[in-house]
C-alpha cells in the first residue's frame, strides 16, 4: 500500500514556519502526516481538528495565538485508581516529553499548549507522536491491569479481503525469495 506521508509537505512546513506563517506551517505538517487530515477532521477555518488515532481522539485547537493539543486517555477505575495514578505519574516524568497527563474528575487526558511562535514543525511532530505513542502503548495495559475504561472506542476500518490476500501473497513471495537468496 502507498504511504500517506508526503515528505515535500514537511519541508514546506519548515519553510513556512521560518517565514512566520505558523498556522500554514502546521497545516503543511498535517498534510505531511496525512493529506486527508485537514479535510476529514478539521473545521473550515483550519483552527480545530479532531483526529482519531487508535483508542484516543487527538483534539487540536488554534486560538488566541496558542496551540492546544489534548487527547482523552482513560476513565479511572473505582478500584485500583491510586496504583494507576502512580504509574501515570511515572509516565508524566519519564515517558511524556512535553505533553503531560491531567486528571479531570475521573478522566485522564494528555495535553500540551504552546504559542504559535514556538511551534516548530519538528517539535509539533514529536509532541503528536509522543501523545499517540503513549495512548497506543498504555491504554490496553491500564484497562487490563487496573480496570480503566476507554474514553473513545477505536474506529477500525478493515482492508478489503482481496487487498489482504494481495499483501499476504506478496509477503510470502518475499519470504521465499529471501530464503532462496541466503541458501
Q: What are the roles of these predicted feature ranges?
A:
Residues 1-78:
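N-terminal catalytic cores of peptidoglycan-degrading enzymes
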Residues 24-28, 80-87, 166:
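Exposed alpha-helical structural elements
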Residues 70-105:
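Short, internal acidic amphipathic alpha-helical interface segments
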Residues 102-126:
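Well-ordered alpha/beta subsegment
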Residues 124-138:
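Short amphipathic C-terminal alpha-helix that caps PH/PH-like domains
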Residues 137-145:
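Pleckstrin homology
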Residues 144-183:
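Charged, amphipathic alpha-helical linkers/stalks
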